[in-house]
Amino acid sequence: MSSPNWLKDLTGAWLFYTVFPKLTRINPRFERIARFSPLIGVLIGVLQVSVLILLLQLQWPNESMPFIAIALGLWITGGIHVDGLMDTADGIAAGPSRCIEAMKDSRIGASGIIALTINLLLQIAALFKLRLLILFAIPIASFWGRYSQIWAISHYPYLNKEGSSKFLHKKNWRGFLIESIPSYAFLSFLIFILINIDISIISTPNLIIGIIVGFLPALIIPHLLARRLGGHSGDSYGASVVLVETCMLIIFSIILPAS
C-alpha cells in the first residue's frame, strides 16, 4: 500500500535538511517538504541535546558544550544553512546590481566570512550564558529558525526561478496557514506539556514566553532580508534559518535565568 503524501514529504524533508540516509522504505517526495522543516529542526535540536547529555554523563566539562552543540549542528545539516548565510552576506555586500551573481558564485567573499564569524561568536556567547538551559533552547531555536522559511516562501517573491529551491516555492504551495499546520500542532502540544509538568531547573512561564516570542524574529528577519534582496532565494532561506536561530539563543539568554 502506498504511503500517504505527508509521510513521503516528511521523509523528503529528513533527507533534504540533514546528512542522514533514508531510514524507512517510504519513497521520499520533495514537493512540500518546507512545511516539515520546523519539525526536522526540532529533531536536529533533540539529537544535539542527546549527545550533550551523554557527554555530560561522561564528565565532559560544561564549558565544551557550546562548541560541541554548534559542531553537531553543522555536521547534521551539512552546513546547508550556513552556506546560505555566507552567500547572502556576499550578495548584499555586492549591491543590487550584482547581488544574484555574487550569491551564485561558489567562492566565499570577505563579507561571507565576517557574517559567519560574527554569527558563530554570538551563538557561542549565548550558549555560554545559558549553560544547562541550552538543552531547552537549542531545539526551540532550531524550530523557529526553520519556521522562518515558511513565512519567507509564503510572503516574498522567489529571486532565482531556476534555483535548486524552486520546488520549495510557489509551485506546490498551499498557503501560509495550511503549510503551518504541522508547526502549530507541535507548538500547541509543547505548550500543553510545559503547562502540565514541573521543570526544576527552569522557569516554565519564561520558557513559554520565549517560545511564543520566537514568532517575531521568524517574521522580521526574512522581511529585512527580502527588503535588501528584493525577494528570497535558497541562500537567503538558509540565512534566515541561521540568523533566527542566533536571535532566539540571544533572547533565551536574556529572559531565562542562569542555571
Swiss-Prot record:
- Pathway info: Cofactor biosynthesis; adenosylcobalamin biosynthesis; adenosylcobalamin from cob(II)yrinate a,c-diamide: step 7/7
Q: Which GO terms describe its cellular component?
A: plasma membrane
Give the reaction(s) catalysed.
alpha-ribazole + adenosylcob(III)inamide-GDP = adenosylcob(III)alamin + GMP + H(+); alpha-ribazole 5'-phosphate + adenosylcob(III)inamide-GDP = adenosylcob(III)alamin 5'-phosphate + GMP + H(+)
Q: Which cofactor does it need?
A: Mg(2+)
Q: Enzyme class, one word?
A: transferase
Which one GO biological process term can you cite for this protein?
A: cobalamin biosynthetic process
- Which residues, if any, are the signal sequence? none
What PANTHER family does this protein map onto? ADENOSYLCOBINAMIDE-GDP RIBAZOLETRANSFERASE
Protein's name according to its UniProt entry: Adenosylcobinamide-GDP ribazoletransferase
- State the organism's lineage: Bacteria, Bacillati, Cyanobacteriota, Cyanophyceae, Synechococcales
